[in-house]
């Protein structure tokens, strides 16, 4: 699967889905060669937390990549969600998920679980190195049994994730600033 985020080229593959952490349900704005999140005036950083996930679930041996850029403080991320359920307004929501999040100083990996009244947020990895805002960056994640193999530009690492489900929904999220997504590819063994 090779998807460019140009007008009319990506919508049939994805579904909007949202974390239970935030009540808003924003959409991406289409630009000529990419999709971008918008400023909302609600969040502290003033930008929407916007997610789209592929419609099918994937497991071990799947490799997903995206090309994205971000403005200062932006954090484009790969979303790995266990399950989806509908909220009272009919929007898809996810409660347990992992994030591989780029930012100006490298990337982080988070494991987030929805609890009864709050979220348990576990910081699994911080990999520090400079990433330039406004420049396109390539992110690839390969799902392995309870492991994630991660490449960001020319750097790589492998991470043990004991709570990684066998089958997951995969997609992208724009977080903590303005983010642009240009392309997404997916391969399976």
Residue ranges and their predicted role:
Residues 1-62, 147:
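Low-complexity, Ser/Thr/Pro/Gly-rich disordered linker/stalk regions
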Residues 42-114:
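Secretory/extracellular carbohydrate-interaction modules
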Residues 50-57, 125-131, 159-160, 170-171:
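Beta-strand-rich interaction surfaces with strong enrichment in secreted/lumenal proteins
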Residues 64-66, 134-150:
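Short tryptophan-centered beta-strand motifs in secreted/extracellular beta-sheet-rich domains
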Residues 115-138:
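Short, aromatic/His-centered strand-loop micro-motif at the edge of beta-sheets
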Residues 149-174:
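Short, solvent-exposed beta-strand-to-loop segments that form ligand-recognition rims
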Residues 165-189:
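Ligand-recognition surfaces built from glycine- and aromatic
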């Amino acid at each position: 699967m090779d998807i460019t985020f140009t007008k009319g080229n990506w919508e049939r593959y994805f579904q909007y889905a949202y974390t239970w952490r935030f009540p808003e349900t924003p959409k991406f704005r289409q630009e000529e060669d990419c999709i971008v999140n918008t400023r909302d005036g609600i969040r502290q950083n003033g930008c929407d937390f916007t997610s789209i996930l592929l419609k099918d679930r994937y497991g071990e041996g799947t490799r997903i990549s995206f090309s994205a850029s971000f403005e200062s403080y932006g954090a484009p991320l790969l979303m790995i969600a266990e399950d989806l359920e509908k909220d009272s307004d009919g929007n898809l929501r996810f409660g347990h998920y992992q994030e591989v999040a780029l930012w100006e100083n490298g990337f982080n990996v988070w494991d987030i679980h929805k609890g009864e009244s709050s979220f348990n947020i576990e910081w699994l990895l911080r990999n520090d190195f400079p990433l330039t805002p406004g420049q396109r960056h390539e992110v690839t994640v390969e799902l392995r049994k309870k492991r994630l193999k991660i490449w960001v530009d020319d750097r790589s690492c492998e991470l043990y994730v004991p709570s990684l489900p066998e089958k997951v929904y995969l997609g992208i999220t724009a977080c903590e600033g303005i983010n642009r997504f240009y392309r997404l590819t997916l391969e399976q063994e």
